[in-house]
Amino acid sequence: DLVRSRGLGDVYKRQVYNEDFNKRAAKNMSNSLYGQGLGLTTLQNAGNYASVEPTFYVRGLQSLSSSSPLVLVDGLERDMSLVTPEEVESVSVLKDAAAVALYGYKGVNGAILITTKRGKYNTREVTFTYDHVTNFQARRPKFVDAATYAEAINEARGYEGLSARYAPEEVDAFRNGATGGGASRMYPYLYPNVNWMDETFKDTGISNKYTIEFSGGGDKFRYYTMLGLLTDKGFVKSPNENDGYSTQNKYSRANLRTNLDIDLTSTTKLKLNLLGALSESSRPGESVDLWDMVYSLPVSYTHLTL
């Protein structure tokens, strides 16, 4: 951390290097910056790889206009989600007068400056990295069984002076399940006891990330190239029941980064930065998805008569 006193206030700058943030298996640079800078607050509301990225606050939660800080990658405005931790050399966090002096109005909520790796003179290096991540549901809801649900309905109706919706024999049928006797053996589909959360979702999801880096150079030429591939599969238990369509939450992204440095003369240098990213995502449904449907399934079918 660097704090310098100026006439109009203190200038704050925090610099984080690759060896600090690249110790965790993060999908992108946004997740690697958690807890890495004093005054840098990160908030993430969900774990969806495809559409949810953390929100950054450099001036605290009271940042002006609720705006995120300015993000620059090698001096150009870029989406931080397209940058992988492996390709980053350092990150600088500017706030207050330091950001405003450099970037004007765009820097009123601070600035995050990302510097990517570059090759070194007279060296050769190849690095391969593989991360395998098992994802868990931190707050998975627990559902009661059908019998407890039926008893709760009867109790609630009793408080309102209404008659019970389910007879004692029906509650017993729910409790015994399809392997029980009596009504449940005769009508297994009329008195089901199914935990739809367990039937729909599995306990874990899998993510894999592959990265290969080439760097080096000679006396007047330096290069750095990074190729990355990220794949993620969600928690849907049986996603391929429909022919030709998968209901799984899936996300994949391929990254390419190339930085070239050429010394044309002793005073003239040419730099070339190339960045490419290709991503694909799919999920079950749009306005309605499986996470919502497990809450709306009825405890039993409507009674039918001939």
Regions flagged by a language model, labelled:
Residues 1, 7-15, 299, 303-306:
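Residue-level detector of conserved catalytic or cofactor/ligand-binding positions
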Residues 5-257, 269-271:
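Short, small/polar-rich motifs associated with maturation and membrane association
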Residues 224, 257, 261-284, 288-294, ...:
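Face-selective signature of the C-terminal outer-membrane beta-barrel domain
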